[in-house]
Amino acid sequence: ISLLRQYETEISLVLLDLVMPVMDGFGVLSYMNERNWIEDIPVIMISGEDSVSYVRRAFDLGVADYIKKPFDAQIVYRRVYNTITLYAKQRRLLLLVADQIYEKEKNNRMMISILSQIVEFRNGESGAHVLHINIITELILERLIQKTDKYDLSGAVRGMIVTASALHDIGKIGIDDKILNKPGRLTNEEFEVIKTHSVIGASMLESLEYYKDEPLVRIAHDICRWHHERYDGKGYPDGLKGEEIPISAQVVALADVYDALISDRVYKKAYSHEKAVEMILNGECGTFNPVSYTHLTLPTKLEV
């Protein structure tokens, strides 16, 4: 056990006897399973016990092979060599698959980023807003999982929410330039037109016939349609209330409002972090899920 602890990442294979003075072979295997070492370190058990129950238990505990005594040294050598070679090939395959997944995810993020930048460019903004939303969304999600386990926020889900957050305003593609880029406050009628961007964005994603049921697209749809909903039901377009609003949309809504407050706009100057948080907590930008406030109430300014 002490050798496993000391050389864990450097061990190529363990030859394990069943009968040992302090801890038997099954005990060692159980210990390795508890620490997930058995996934990375192949074990060959060598034993004089040849009953089916012993062999089955050994394989159930994760051994790669079981050699019965007495044994031939050359046969043991070949089986050790074959096991090490097999595990090495598996590791190379896992690395290859991981690289392919990484490249696919990187390309997905790149295409989404390009599309979102097009929207921001048309909206007359620098494109930094999308990057800010990504960063703030990720920070809020990280704090949210520390605060509660109420939501399904696995690493994969959080990653998709962060990626999809870049598309939150994609519906603005369908808004008239004169309204979208008006250098002043909007009239009530113009604001009603702007509000349609959430439905337009969701409809665009719904029209993706072959991809609309993909998890990333579903999350992006929820964010597009409902990132202007508010926890008290006074948002738009559907007046959803409380937990009727998907957590993805709740988090992006808060990130969107916070970034809008701390950023310069044609109709206003940027507020400080402290002032922005104060305005959000006072409900000046609508009501949000109290749990999601956690990150913004930290004393340190968010670096975006």
Predicted regions located by residue number:
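Active-site beta3 strand of CheY-like receiver
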Residues: 9-15
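Receiver (REC) domain active-site loop signature in two-component systems and cognate sites
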Residues: 20
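C-terminal output helix
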Residues: 53, 71-80
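Metal-dependent catalytic cores of enzymes that make or break cyclic nucleotides
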Residues: 120-296
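Single conserved hydrophobic/aromatic residue that forms the stacking wall/gate
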Residues: 295-304
